[in-house]
Amino acid sequence: SLRGRALTSELFPFSFAEVLAHRGIEVPGQWPVVGVERSRLQNEFTRYLSVGGFPEVQRFEEDFWRRTLQSYLEIALLRDVAERHAIGNVQALRFLVRRVLRSIGSRVSVNALHKDLQAQRIAVGKDQVYSQLAHVEDAFLAFLLPLHANSERRRQMNPRKAYAIDHGLVRACTPGRDS
C-alpha cells in the first residue's frame, strides 16, 4: 500500500520533574525537603511510579489511565512492531512484551523466553525471539541492557536486564500489581 512520507521525532514520557511542572507543582529550591512539602512530593512520586509519564494520562483516575495505557501498548505492538516488521505471530509478540514488562529490573534470557513460549504451546523459533525483542526495543517499549562488565565476552554471555520506557506501561499490563 502507498503511504505518505512522514517526519519522525522521538517523544519520551515525562520525567518526574516534568510531571510536577505539568501538574502545576513547584519543585522546591532547597533540599532536603521537610514537612508537608516532603509528604506531598512523596505522594506525587508514588503516583508517578504508578501512572508513569505519558502526559495524557496524568489527569485520569486509575481505571481510565490503566485502560488508556493498555491501549497505547496494544497500538504500539500492532502498528509499531507487528505491522512495521511483518510479524505474523502476534500471539508470541504479545506474550514476549508482557513477559519482558513483568520482568523489569530482572535478567531476561532468550532461552528462558523461548522455553516459556514453548510451555504455552506458542510455536516460535529462537531466532524469531531474538528479532522480535530487537523490534520491541526499536519501538521504544522496553530495553534489554547488558551486564556492566569490562569484558565483552561477559557482557555477551550474561542475560540482559529488562527496563520499560515508562512505569505506567508496566502497571497497565500487570493487573493487581501494587509496586
Give the ranges of each region predicted by the language model:
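Accessory nucleic acid-recognition modules appended to NTPase machines
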Residues: 60-179
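Interdomain motor-coupling "hinge/lid" segment immediately C-terminal to the ATP-binding subdomain
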Residues: 1-106
